[in-house]
Regions:
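Primarily residues marking transmembrane-helix entry/exit sites
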Residues: 7-8, 42-43, 77, 135, ...
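Membrane-interface helix-loop junctions in multi-pass transport and translocation proteins
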Residues: 1-14, 66, 70, 78, ...
């Protein structure tokens, strides 16, 4: 159904996705987990930061899609990358909820989320691939996994964001998370080049 070139098309975008996702998460999940006392404002700041950076990265990469396609000399990457990069929009909404689930040891809930996301996205990806959508099936599978996972994390986590946008708590977490960002970016670059 899928051949190596289909995986290669999606794989070409992996470096962009990996670096942008690392910056979007910014090590704040680990920073929240590391804090002894976490307030609503801390989770809220991470939620708004990751959501807004998700929108920003999607817009940047959406408009850079022709440049990415030109770099690889693959015009098909324009449409494909614009679909794959939707993961930033969906993923940003689940980062703070995921940190809450992790911090409060809601392991059973996280396992359910992963299983449901995997089964649903796998079904959709296989169905699309069997119907001739090739690498688009892989792309939709990926964003479906991210989207369902983010939605379920939001549902399962008792914490909910509010519209009181205050990014000040991020400054306090940044001393811890900044080291993780750099390490993770270098790791992603070395793994994807």
């Amino acid at each position: 159904v899928l051949d190596a070139s289909d995986y290669g098309m999606v794989g070409m975008l992996a470096i962009f996705s990996a670096i942008a996702s690392t910056i979007q998460e910014s090590g704040f999940t680990a920073a929240l987990t590391n804090q002894k006392e976490i307030k609503h404002e801390d989770y809220n700041a991470v939620f708004w930061f990751s959501s807004l950076t998700g929108v920003l990265f999607y817009l940047i990469l959406f408009f850079c899609a022709p440049l990415i396609a030109e770099f690889y000399d693959k015009p098909e990457l324009i449409g494909l990358s614009r679909i794959v990069f939707l993961g930033f929009l969906f993923g940003g909404f689940g980062i703070a909820s995921n940190a809450y689930l992790f911090k409060t040891l809601m392991v059973k809930e996280r396992a359910k989320i992963d299983i449901v996301s995997l089964i649903c996205s796998g079904f959709i990806g296989v169905t699309l691939s069997l119907n001739g959508f090739a690498y688009y099936g892989l792309a939709v599978q990926t964003i479906t996994y991210i989207g369902i996972g983010s939605l379920l994390k939001f549902i399962y986590a008792p914490w909910k964001p509010t519209f009181q946008i205050d990014l000040h708590p991020l400054k306090l977490m940044f001393s811890f998370s900044s080291k993780l960002i750099l390490t993770n970016i270098f790791t992603q670059i070395s793994n994807n080049i």
